């Protein structure tokens, strides 16, 4: 006999922070009658999703990967940014075996050391201080041909802010006496995660062959030309930078290629294009045999040396539910599917026993301000059906809209995105009420609550460090103040009457009144 479940749903509203300032605050200006009603009727508060509370440096804005790892693991997880920065400060980085082996092999073969990654101080996917440390280490170990392939940000940083970084690295290479910036391209192309291989192929051709839409003798000149074409950092077309003899850099057999992004989701596709023998995303004109190293683990099926392998997280929420014989569902759109699965499970790719997954394709549009509702209606259709099926104890769902549309910098579209999500929440809450279920509504980090940079006047496309909402739609309860994302998993187990494993250092935030 099938037991009917009374589920607890965790709705993660991606990029949905709380901000007192209402100026260009898309969440404040959106018409959200459902959330307004829930906040009036049910216990609610604010929790932290940034900085030290999620294992990032003090004051560092949160991000989706970090947020979901903390949400799912029930503990503060020391993030890769902090871990690698500490290794650099302690002079351990320059002795890292995977990095040293790749550089030494290239030097011995008379080859080049190619370093690629998001050249940004954003700290979300990478940090330019890590890239600088890698450049210094390569030269210190005898590399005379060091080529930096810079992916430009403008998403976790202001839209036109790359000039300072490029100038700094030009100066760095002059100081080191070796190396140069070999190419620049926007992250829109190099860091796609939605199988838009036509974008990734442009980055691949740029790095392997120096084949580009544009060619310049200086990276800053290339950037200024992109701005003249009305391309912000994120969207800069492939631009090869020539040396003093007018030659472009190319990737050749025996070279080292080191990928300096520490966040996995937007690093996977381009990595597979370099290392998978059976790769079929696009036609590769050349496939040089290189020593490829990833800074962190991007996926279990990516077979390359890893400078900083993942630390094993035991007894995450998913694992505890499996071990207690509970059922669970993970559901989101393409853009955040990895977050409710891989990241929520502490970096584990395979589903746990009793864990089902539903993937809804994100719309195929150039940027999500063109369709701010994204695929939220279809996502909610599937979610409501899953709730009504009464076969899951716990449901984890991510609505990407606030973050993905917030990143475009389009205020009006972000308002529409928030309104679309609010309508969907209404349907989910109604479905849960019919089966006696309960719901926690929260976010992984802020974004849509700040759509303009108060200092520069530019569009604000990055995440924020604001607190995020925490609403319990269920029994009469109180909510503790001062919570953080790592308190959410223990809270769910507490509501289910389950014991909380010792590995979870977070504390239950919700206390049901007797």
Curated annotation (Swiss-Prot):
Q: Which GO BP terms sit in this record?
A: glucose catabolic process; glycolytic process
Which cofactors must be present for this protein to function? Mn(2+)
Q: Where is the active site?
A: 64 (phosphoserine intermediate)
The record's listing under Pfam families reads: iPGM_N, Metalloenzyme
- For this protein, what reaction is catalysed? (2R)-2-phosphoglycerate = (2R)-3-phosphoglycerate
Tell me one GO molecular function of this protein.
manganese ion binding
Annotated residues that bind substrate are located at 125, 155-156, 187, 193, 263-266, 336
Q: Which GO terms describe its cellular component?
A: cytosol
Q: What is this protein called?
A: 2,3-bisphosphoglycerate-independent phosphoglycerate mutase
What gene codes for this chain?
A: gpmI
């Amino acid at each position: 006999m099938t037991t009917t479940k009374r589920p607890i749903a965790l709705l993660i509203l991606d990029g949905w922070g709380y901000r007192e300032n209402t100026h260009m605050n898309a969440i404040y200006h959106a018409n959200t009658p459902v959330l307004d009603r829930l906040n009036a009727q049910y216990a609610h508060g604010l929790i932290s999703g940034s900085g030290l509370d999620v294992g990032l440096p003090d004051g560092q804005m949160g991000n989706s990967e970090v947020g979901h790892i903390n949400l799912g693991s029930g503990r503060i997880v020391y993030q890769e940014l902090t871990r690698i920065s500490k290794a650099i400060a302690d002079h351990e980085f320059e002795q890292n075996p995977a990095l040293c082996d790749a550089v030494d092999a290239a030097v011995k073969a008379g080859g080049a050391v190619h370093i690629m990654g998001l050249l940004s101080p954003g700290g979300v996917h990478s940090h330019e201080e890590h890239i600088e440390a890698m450049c210094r280490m390569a030269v210190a170990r005898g590399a005379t041909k060091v080529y930096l392939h810079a992916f430009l940000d403008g998403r976790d940083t202001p839209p036109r802010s790359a000039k300072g970084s490029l100038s700094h690295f030009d100066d760095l290479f002059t100081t080191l006496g070796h190396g140069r910036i070999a190419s620049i391209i926007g992250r829109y192309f190099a860091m796609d995660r939605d199988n838009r291989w036509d974008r990734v192929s442009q980055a691949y051709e740029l790095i392997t062959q120096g084949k580009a839409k544009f060619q310049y003798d200086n990276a800053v000149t290339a950037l200024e030309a992109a701005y003249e074409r009305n391309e912000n950092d994120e969207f800069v077309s492939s631009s090869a930078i020539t040396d003093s003899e007018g030659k472009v850099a190319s990737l050749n057999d025996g070279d080292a290629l080191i990928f300096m992004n520490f966040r996995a989701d937007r690093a996977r596709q381009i990595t597979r294009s370099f290392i998978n023998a059976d790769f079929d995303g696009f036609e590769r004109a050349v496939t040089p045999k290189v020593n490829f190293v990833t800074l962190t683990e991007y996926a279990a099926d990516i077979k390359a040396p890893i400078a900083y392998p993942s630390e094993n997280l035991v007894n995450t929420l998913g694992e505890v539910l499996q071990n207690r014989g509970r059922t669970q569902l993970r559901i989101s759109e393409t853009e955040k599917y990895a977050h409710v699965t891989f990241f929520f499970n502490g970096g584990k790719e395979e589903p746990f026993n009793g864990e089902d997954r539903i993937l809804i394709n994100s719309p195929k549009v150039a940027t999500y301000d063109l369709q701010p509702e994204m695929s939220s209606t279809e996502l909610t259709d599937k979610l409501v059906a899953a709730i009504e099926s009464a076969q899951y104890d716990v449901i984890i769902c991510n609505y990407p809209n606030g973050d993905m549309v917030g990143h475009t910098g389009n205020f009006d579209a972000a308002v529409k995105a928030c309104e679309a999500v609010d309508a969907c929440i209404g349907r989910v809450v109604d479905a849960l009420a019919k089966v006696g279920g309960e719901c926690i509504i929260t976010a992984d980090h802020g974004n849509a609550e700040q759509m303009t940079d108060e200092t520069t006047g530019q569009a604000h496309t990055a995440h924020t460090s604001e607190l995020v909402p925490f609403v319990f739609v269920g029994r009469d309860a109180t909510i503790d103040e001062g919570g953080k994302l790592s308190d959410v998993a223990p809270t769910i187990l507490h509501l289910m009457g389950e014991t909380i494993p010792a590995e979870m250092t977070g504390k239950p935030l919700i206390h049901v009144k007797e």
